[in-house]
Curated annotation (Swiss-Prot):
EC category: hydrolase
Disulphide-bridged cysteine pairs: 46-138, 48-64, 63-118, 69-145, 70-111, 79-104, 97-109
Listed name of the protein: Group IID secretory phospholipase A2
PANTHER family: GROUP IID SECRETORY PHOSPHOLIPASE A2, PHOSPHOLIPASE A2 FAMILY MEMBER
Annotated GO CC locations: extracellular region
Organism annotation: Homo sapiens (Human)
Residues forming the catalytic site: 67, 112
Signal peptide location: 1-20
Binding site for Ca(2+): 47, 49, 51, 68
Lineage: Eukaryota, Metazoa, Chordata, Craniata, Vertebrata
Length: 145
């Protein structure tokens, strides 16, 4: 089990930095929450990280489920959520998405901004036991968007 987890982290560490939108999200979450996303959030609960199923486990997991819905909507609009790179500024604890990019880039930034601040609002209920949560335990109906 530990070896599989380590392999998963190595794969994720190799994928995240080379993809545009994911690179933005990773940086934004780190700036807003102060946590290293690849260790704290991408393998968290039933919805944080790649894919998602079942009932979210806590408020942090709900942030990720809502973010999944935001990305799903952008995909239906033809946006390349994992490749589009957007510009934003982080200043005095706030995020300002640039209005110079395409519609998809602006909306992608808005989705990522929302999840970053949602995660920050729920830092006090973050549960270490939900990091690296075993996804087969994610049961129940997946909430709709």
């Amino acid at each position: 089990m530990e070896l599989a987890l380590l392999c998963g982290l190595v794969v994720m560490a190799g994928v995240i930095p080379i993809q545009g939108g994911i690179l933005n999200l990773n940086k934004m979450v780190k700036q807003v929450t102060g946590k290293m996303p690849i260790l704290s959030y991408w393998p968290y609960g039933c919805h944080c990280g790649l894919g998602g199923r079942g009932q979210p486990k806590d408020a942090t997991d709900w942030c990720c489920q809502t973010h999944d819905c935001c990305y799903d909507h952008l995909k239906t609009q033809g946006c390349s959520i994992y490749k589009d790179y957007y510009r934003y500024n982080f200043s005095q604890g706030n995020i300002h998405c640039s209005d110079k990019g395409s519609w998809c880039e602006q909306q992608l930034c808005a989705c990522d901004k929302e999840v970053a601040f949602c995660l920050k609002r729920n830092l006090d209920t973050y549960q270490k036991r939900l990091r690296f949560y075993w996804r087969p335990h994610c049961r129940g109906q997946t909430p709709g968007c």
